[in-house]
């Protein structure tokens, strides 16, 4: 999708369609020619459009405009929230994409509480996401959309808007990279495949270097927890390290992203139920969001030093697989009693977290994982859980989520929960019982991040949409992560 901005008089601006947001209590935009405003007014009085929230109506042959049609979008009778505005952008884009329109123009909304820069940046991102399609495996893909370009229009020239749409598009591209990886079937997307994706990114972007540790190398280094998960599969586990140097390394160290990359999760010996097990291909959503964030950072050429680590493995039942009751030694030297092999994400993450701290000395570490079903019970599909040992980091991530509509919610990491992980035989066990499952999983990870500013995002409820024809990866939390990185570049 191509984007542009314009402040040419609307009468001289050629487009197949002009998108206009209208509320029940708002006057018609003065930027529209008087004849067009009168035409819309008559259209409304006739009952064809009442500006109710989410209503979309085509008005053909608008007067005194060099556009074939108007798409009228109702905003209702009260001010739109940011989330409501983004939802309307998504809905309008879907309508445009299913029409004959090739080039559309979007009349920016002076009545919205957010800035024009925000509207263009987040609008471009949502448009990029809304035109996404994944039909790689269909023998007869659906016809491609005609929509190729969207121009944001405002009467006053604003030099920030060009940068805004470029930023929005780059984030949207990153989101769609994450969605592509999540939507791939597990027979094609496995740990070695993800290594190939990383290497391809390294070839595409000069400032990105890639290193891959094999399962054997990881085991030799002492990653006993990671190896315990990976050894049950014919597919070899991989520790994938991508280092982006958009700024010179400093004594402070880089920011690190660490993603859980379980490309398929059967639960291992603690086998999951068969129903919806197909959706366990999405258990690499954390890794997918790391790849997507790296893509965006490279596209924007951000002036930061970033290290991104993906712990990629399959969790499969096998004669070599870890058993409930096994005790393993982690890279940190701490020992873990494995009581449930389906609590494998924290096992691969704990060694990846230790690795990135030992090798790269980051000042901030953020891990991202589809970690617990308990998080879905607590927060549903709207917010990812945000845990952190640093209040400023937590607040920065929550602010980034609010800014982009990719929202999170703060969760406790109180010492009182740590006792649920006590083991009679090892330093800790990998589950904390039936209560507060998302919290105890985060407490487990906190034991491997005591010396660094750290946050954990549990995205089990937000990484994909479950069931039905709308099923698919969402690409979250790429918008939150990339906004945080931009704010701290």
From Swiss-Prot:
Active-site residues from the entry: 272, 346
Q: Which EC number(s) are documented for this chain?
A: 3.4.11.1, 3.4.11.10
Q: Which residues bind Mn(2+) 2?
A: 260, 265, 283, 344
| One Pfam assignment | Peptidase_M17_N
Where found, per UniProt?
Answer: Cytoplasm
Gene Ontology CC annotation, any one: cytoplasm
Its catalytic activity?
Release of an N-terminal amino acid, Xaa-|-Yaa-, in which Xaa is preferably Leu, but may be other amino acids including Pro although not Arg or Lys, and Yaa may be Pro. Amino acid amides and methyl esters are also readily hydrolyzed, but rates on arylamides are exceedingly low; Release of an N-terminal amino acid, preferentially leucine, but not glutamic or aspartic acids
Q: What biological-process GO terms show up in the record?
A: proteolysis
Details of cofactor binding: Binds 2 manganese ions per subunit.
Q: Does the keyword Cytoplasm apply?
A: yes
> Binding residues for Mn(2+) 1, per the UniProt record?
265, 342, 344
Family listed? Belongs to the peptidase M17 family.
What is the name of the protein in this document? Probable cytosol aminopeptidase
Q: What organism does the UniProt record list as the source?
A: Alcanivorax borkumensis (strain ATCC 700651 / DSM 11573 / NCIMB 13689 / SK2)
> Lineage of this protein's species?
Bacteria, Pseudomonadati, Pseudomonadota, Gammaproteobacteria, Oceanospirillales
Q: Which gene encodes it?
A: pepA
